[in-house]
Amino acid sequence: MKIISTTFLSILLFVLTNQVFSESKNSKWVNLFNGKDLSGWHNPYSHGEFNVVKGVIELVADKKFFLAHDNQVSDFILQAEIKLPLGKANSGFLFRSQKRENGSMFGYQAEVDGSDRKWSGGLYDEGRRGWIHPKKPIENSYNKKNWKTERQEAFKRNDWNHYKIRCQGEHIQIWVNGVKTTDLKDSTDAKGFIAIQHHGEKGQVYRFRNIKILKL
């Protein structure tokens, strides 16, 4: 039994190592934001302001909007950093997202939650199904099992936070500051846009930096 367990662990380690090596060897990280201007980005909405200040994207608005990258992607690893403003604030990273005819965006969103609810790193379906993980209401058996303290405490409220999103096929994973917060399968959208959100709080400035992608 011990031999079988050792063999299994060796095979598993080999597969995981080979996967990481394969990704790094055959692919290349690409900066979606060059740190100087917003080349490659666009605002599909009729409202919302966006600027680059000292290598940081700053979003300002009095209504919710998303600043979207021009290219659609399917399987990838996305890494980015976000800093929420003080006070009431909420944001997110759209991925594999879609656009309606009026320009509004919808689809998968990695949640950035500035409230005491502490759902940062959850998976939200913006403009469509709503919460996928965790689930409403806040107190329920699913959340008790799948949204434990480590995930709740991963986000640093008044600091920069690192997000990692991995999509391959229907497998979706999200990390916040190195803590895996979402790991599930959903096949609703296989390809779409990357976008960053201002939630619409007047006078609030949302900041993003170090946005890069590795296509799988």
State the predicted function of each range.
Residues 20-216:
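Carbohydrate-interacting regions of secretory-pathway proteins
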Residues 1-25:
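Bacterial Sec-dependent N-terminal signal peptides
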